[in-house]
Amino acid sequence: MQSILSSLDKRWRRGGSRMPQLRWQTCLFITINAVIISLLLLDGPVGSGGIAPAIRRLGRALTDFGASGWLIIVSAFLLFEGWATLRVVKSLKTRMQALQICWTGAYLLTSIILSGVIANFLKRTIGRARPQHFEDYGILSFSPFSGHAGFESFPSGHATTIGAFFAAFSLLFPRCRILFLACALWLGMTRVMVGAHYPSDVIAGLALGGWFSLMIAIVYSHYGLLFKTDLDGWPVPKRLLQA
């Protein structure tokens, strides 16, 4: 463990790349406005039961693909499979591939788990009532720290996981970025289709997960792990021989 920490410290000191200009204030402003617009225009119709049965069935068929459990298991498998392979193989190329797989699993794990912890803390702190309680409480009812799942709607934990997972893959495979972002939007909105969340919950969750994956990628790029930084300081995937 000491050798790992020492290696990471050396990588951090060696990484002299500058941080990207994130313009987080602008992005936060856009996200907040998207949430408010969704709350005003979309949350009411969703809460009043304006979702067709066919759409609900579609949502139920797809929504579990965004569950954190299996994504964490797959990520952990990549991490430990890469680590185990690294310990037994001798070929330099194979070791580099194993190291890449190991760090990919670690990146996905940190992005999904830590963003999920934040989302769950926010859900319990805010305590927004879910759509199932719309008739009794409307769209703006809050019961912080109630300990009841029916009052843990904002932000969507599923959407946070989905946002983190697909944002991570967008950064790892930038050529497929549009496809991954479309998948994130569709899977996130299945939470609305099944009546578990309002659209504003999903928008906030997707944004939280996506931004968290970007932050983790920036940290990894500064250490030279899995990512490198481009001329503007943004994380881009490293080629295998650069790992």
Indicate where each model-derived feature is located.
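Interfacial segments of alpha-helical transmembrane regions
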Residues: 86-120
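Alpha-helical membrane-inserting segments
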Residues: 43, 118, 122, 212-220
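Small-polar-interrupted transmembrane alpha-helices in polytopic inner-membrane proteins
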Residues: 39, 110-124, 179-191
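N-terminal transmembrane-helix/juxtamembrane module of multi-pass inner/ER membrane proteins
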Residues: 1-80, 124-126, 130-146, 243
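Alpha-helical transmembrane segments of integral membrane proteins
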Residues: 24-28, 99-111, 176-179, 204
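Membrane-embedded catalytic cores of phosphoryl/pyrophosphoryl-handling enzymes
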Residues: 13-20, 84-85, 137-243
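Membrane-interfacial segments
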Residues: 50, 82-93, 122-130, 134, ...
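Alpha-helical transmembrane spans of integral membrane proteins, capturing the lipid-embedded, hydrophobic core
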Residues: 29, 33, 108-116, 206, ...
